[in-house]
């Protein structure tokens, strides 16, 4: 009996048994395509035929792990967990034009200069175009081998013959496997190409970096299984109106996840920013209502960013809630806690919240800084310019201490801040030179800082 066909959404990877004009999972139109599986074998069990026994090893061993290779770009090495691990597969995603190809071309040049045999394969540009960009970035003398190809079989044959230590594939969506009957960029093609390249990396000890396109929602396009296949998933983020870019690790088998590296886009490519807090606060002027500095932690790195809030009477029947750089659902929670526990209503008021510089913050410890910015804007009262705020707010109005308090305070002190407002409790800290004002609940915070509540 013939196997019934399956259909996949090219946007989200959802699999269905029949074709439809609109994907039921993500709602996208005209993205359903027939899925041609990778395997051509029969859809039966393995049966009684015996396979070869695999070689087993002990978990404990005296063999030293292969050393990491650093490229000299400190921010990239930090995100990778201390350097490039041999035989690792890395997926890098980001919006179009954000600088993925520029970053990886610079990384390829640095790795090649450090002694790694490096091959850069582009499926989107001709070799001459990649060479032009390398000349503009001052990388023309780097010993990097270039190729412009999309046929996966030819690429794997070339890698087998050249035996590089690092291969960069730009991008995985342009790769074409001739054993899969689907168009390049489809779910089947992306899954097959990622599987073949990842298997090659493990089998031959080659580090492979894959560039991935992203969807409108900011997720890497193609099936989610690709992110499970690779060892590391990096997102390259940034706002087009700002000069800096953030490389964020969302998965890393060989280092900390949520680590970030900060770069600045210049005429000569991407330059690393060793002190991102100073960059994010560089344009901060005199203290103004609604402006609060949050001492946050991104991965293992303390980062200071500015929250800006604006509260104004709403001319509409339903007040607006606009958030940039933070979670809108968490803003609604903070507004509800302020009204229920402190008696401060925001009904009939438009609320706008922004993280300055285009930075994205997801840490719960930003709750208290957001509440302070909202109250400062509503009461038209500025917080002192030398004060940082951090702490998590519970639904009861109690404040919970944040982790790594000492690292946050040290970073704030380094940038000239002398006061901090945080939740009471947690481990005692010994940072001198900065006064720490501990609050137990949101009511006491409102009463002491803003004289209300």
Feature map (PLM): residue ranges:
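Conserved RecA-like ASCE P-loop NTPase motor core of nucleic-acid helicases/translocases
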Residues: 118-122
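Peripheral, non-AAA+ core regions of ATP-driven protein-machinery
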Residues: 2-11, 15-80, 85-93, 98-109, ...
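Conserved Walker A/P-loop ATP-binding site and its immediately adjacent core
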Residues: 123-129
């Amino acid at each position: 009996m013939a196997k019934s066909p399956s259909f996949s959404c090219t946007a989200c990877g959802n699999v269905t048994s029949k074709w439809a004009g609109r994907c039921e999972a993500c709602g996208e139109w005209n993205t359903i395509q027939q899925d041609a599986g990778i395997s051509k074998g029969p859809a039966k069990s393995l049966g009684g035929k015996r396979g070869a026994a695999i070689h087993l090893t002990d978990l404990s061993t005296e063999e030293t792990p292969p050393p990491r290779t650093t490229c000299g770009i400190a921010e990239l090495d930090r995100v990778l967990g201390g350097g490039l691990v041999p035989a690792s597969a890395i997926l890098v995603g980001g919006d179009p034009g954000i600088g993925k190809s520029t970053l990886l071309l610079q990384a390829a040049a640095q790795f090649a200069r450090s002694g790694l045999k490096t091959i850069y394969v582009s499926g989107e540009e001709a070799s001459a175009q990649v060479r032009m960009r390398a000349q503009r970035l001052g990388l023309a003398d780097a010993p990097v081998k270039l190729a412009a190809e999309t046929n996966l079989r030819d690429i794997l044959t070339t890698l087998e013959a050249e035996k590089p230590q690092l291969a960069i594939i730009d991008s995985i969506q342009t790769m074409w496997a001739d054993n899969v009957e689907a168009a390049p960029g489809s779910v089947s093609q992306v899954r097959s190409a990622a599987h073949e390249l990842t298997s090659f990396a493990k089998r031959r000890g080659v580090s492979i970096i894959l560039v991935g396109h992203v969807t409108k929602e900011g997720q890497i396009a193609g099936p989610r299984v690709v992110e499970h296949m690779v060892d590391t998933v990096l997102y390259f983020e940034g706002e087009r109106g700002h000069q800096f870019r953030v490389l964020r690790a969302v998965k890393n088998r060989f280092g900390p996840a949520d680590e970030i590296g900060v770069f600045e886009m210049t005429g000569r490519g991407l330059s690393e920013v060793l002190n991102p807090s100073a960059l994010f606060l560089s344009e901060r002027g005199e203290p103004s209502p609604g402006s609060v500095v949050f001492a946050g932690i991104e991965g293992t790195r303390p980062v200071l960013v500015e929250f800006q809030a604006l509260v104004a009477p709403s001319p509409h029947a339903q007040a607006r809630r606009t958030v940039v750089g933070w979670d809108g659902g968490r803003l609604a929670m903070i507004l509800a806690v302020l009204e229920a526990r402190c008696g401060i209503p925001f009904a009939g008021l438009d609320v706008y919240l922004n993280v300055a510089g285009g930075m994205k913050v997801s840490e719960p410890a930003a709750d208290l800084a957001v509440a302070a910015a909202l109250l400062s804007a509503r009461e038209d009262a500025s917080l002192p310019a030398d004060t940082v705020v951090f702490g998590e707010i519970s639904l009861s109005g109690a404040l919970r201490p944040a982790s790594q308090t000492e690292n946050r305070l040290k970073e704030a002190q380094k940038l000239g801040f002398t006061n901090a407002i945080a939740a009471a409790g947690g481990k005692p800290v010994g940072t001198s030179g900065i006064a720490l004002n501990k609050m137990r609940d949101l009511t006491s915070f409102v009463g002491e800082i803003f004289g209300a509540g």
